[in-house]
Amino acid sequence: MRYTSGAIETLIDEFARLPGIGRKTAQRLCMHMLNEPRTAAEKLAKALLDVKDRVIRCSECQNVTDRDSDPCVLCRSSGRDRTVICVVESPVDLLAFEKTGHYKGLYHVLHGVISPLDGIGPDDIKVRELLARVSRPEESLQVREVVLALNPTVEGETTSLYISRLLKPLGIAVSKIARGIPVGAELEFIDEATLSRAMEGRSAM
Amino acid sequence: MRYTSGAIETLIDEFARLPGIGRKTAQRLCMHMLNEPRTAAEKLAKALLDVKDRVIRCSECQNVTDRDSDPCVLCRSSGRDRTVICVVESPVDLLAFEKTGHYKGLYHVLHGVISPLDGIGPDDIKVRELLARVSRPEESLQVREVVLALNPTVEGETTSLYISRLLKPLGIAVSKIARGIPVGAELEFIDEATLSRAMEGRSAM
Ligand SMILES: [Zn+2]
Ligand SMILES: [Zn+2]
């Protein structure tokens, strides 16, 4: 048995296509939209199309930005240290660093990591664009350090190594963010791999 | 810190307005749409507007139906017993009964329950429309029984009592669905109120 409305069925189907949205949730969302004014549906519909029509990748850092704002606000900002580039996998990771408010350099978004098993090679992510950025002759744009901030997965590590080998011959300092005990975490609840990394990465006091 | 794209921020805001969708989930859904082809966004956008433009309430049973299908398929069906009407709170509850495949009568959807604390009175839900249905003089449409299938809440019980008092003087049999132990449930895990109800509602074997 399905709903007595084809329009309702279709909207439930479309909601259920979204990741992490099951049929029960899709049904609840659809019923919610039924009870909302038409303007609510219009706003969500417009936002969906706008994201497809207006969002592009910044020609500098490959971060997401609006069509009428390229390079992105971060790349255009006069308050950023242009000698450091932090390399991240996704715009969400970039946002995580920005939220800390501590990092003041530039970014480069790879939009993925090298993953041979998934058929993703260096040319499928934004490695070439990174290389172009750090190779520019203009003195004012000289990048001195690239900080790799990829996820601690096998693919992330592989990608970090690959990029590091490309950049070092260019005389650029390449670093990697520290792995260790999260702030506020209790040692007894930390997994062994993290503990080992924390021990390896110990620093003098 | 927000995204470097206004279009992305707007879509996250709109997703986060949906019930049960937090900001993290909204962010994930937005990133998903960014990676989908434009047709995926178009389909969801169209489905949202269609639900507002095409869905109406059946003039007979108040169930949701499409504009070009009134009365709804259930009310038009020749295979239903027109002497019984099952009264439910919402289209979702109607669907739950239809899924069982056992009930073959008609329905009436109240679209809510009487709730004085929320300022919802009998005229704010579809009680008047139910009264009109059972009061029709045509012999062929004569309703003999109304089954109240509202949720076992204070408001549901109040509404059941209210409707029952309206219908009984009209010579219509009014019944209420049984409360009791769910099929397959183990007694030890059933709450006391349900156990008491099950005991009260015991039937001869
Ligand atoms: Zn940028
Ligand atoms: Zn109907």
Curated annotation (Swiss-Prot), chains A, B:
According to its UniProt entry, the protein's GO biological process terms are: DNA recombination; DNA repair
**Toprim domain location, by residue?**
83-182
- Alphabetical list of SUPFAM superfamilies matching this protein: Recombination protein RecR
PROSITE patterns referenced in this protein's UniProt entry, alphabetically: TOPRIM
Zinc fingers, C4-type class:
58-75
Against Gene3D superfamilies, the record matches this protein to:
3.40.1360.10, 6.10.250.240, RecR Domain 1
Single Gene Ontology MF annotation: zinc ion binding
Q: Which InterPro entries match?
A: DNA_Rcmb_RecR, Rcmb_RecR, TOPRIM_dom, TOPRIM_RecR
Q: What keywords would UniProt list here?
A: DNA damage, DNA recombination, DNA repair, Metal-binding, Zinc, Zinc-finger
As for what it does, the entry says:
May play a role in DNA repair. It seems to be involved in an RecBC-independent recombinational process of DNA repair. It may act with RecF and RecO.
Q: Which family does it belong to?
A: Belongs to the RecR family.
**Which named protein is this?**
Recombination protein RecR
Q: Which organism is it from?
A: Chlorobium phaeobacteroides (strain DSM 266 / SMG 266 / 2430)
Highest classification ranks of the organism: Bacteria, Pseudomonadati, Chlorobiota, Chlorobiia, Chlorobiales
